Amino acid sequence: MVPISIIRNRVAKVAVGSAAVLGLAVGFQTPAVAAAPTATVTPSSGLSDGTVVKVAGAGLQAGTAYDVGQCAWVDTGVLACNPADFSSVTADANGSASTSLTVRRSFEGFLFDGTRWGTVDCTTAACQVGLSDAAGNGPEGVAISFN
């Protein structure tokens, strides 16, 4: 079992990053010449429980560690994440990163403060995969869907 302090830390990073990207929090914007970071998830649709997907990021901060995880919008402005399957990756010198992540059709969701939300069902909730650094910065989350 993962200690609750680790759950709080990891969920907070991914949740804050996802919320900031979706306009729910204000973040520092880099100069206009810098491209916004992007993320891709392959495959992202027609998934089965336990599918291992490839998560890639570009335009990231070189040398920065990112947590990668699955989250869902469970209520207006409320994001619950699955810390049990989180992974980490560090962006290379070009600002690119790639890792694998196991995604779940349903999972025990935790809020950014570590509060247990309850069971999240990705066949009814808007689930996504996201990347976030320690400050909560990262590309927009990528929507995923299950069979």
UniProtKB/Swiss-Prot annotation:
Signal peptide: 1-34
GO biological process: defense response to bacterium
Entry's Gene Ontology molecular function annotations: DNA binding
SS bonds (residue pairs): C71-C81, C122-C127
Keywords for the protein's UniProt record, in alphabetical order: Antibiotic, Antimicrobial, Disulfide bond, DNA-binding, Signal
Task of the protein: NCS has antibiotic activity (for Gram-positive bacteria) and antitumor activity (for certain mouse tumors). NCS binds non-covalently to a chromophore which is the cytotoxic and mutagenic component of the antibiotic. The chromophore binds to DNA as a weak intercalator and causes single- and double-strand breaks.
Family per similarity comment: Belongs to the neocarzinostatin family.
Protein's recorded name: Neocarzinostatin
Gene it is expressed from: ncsA
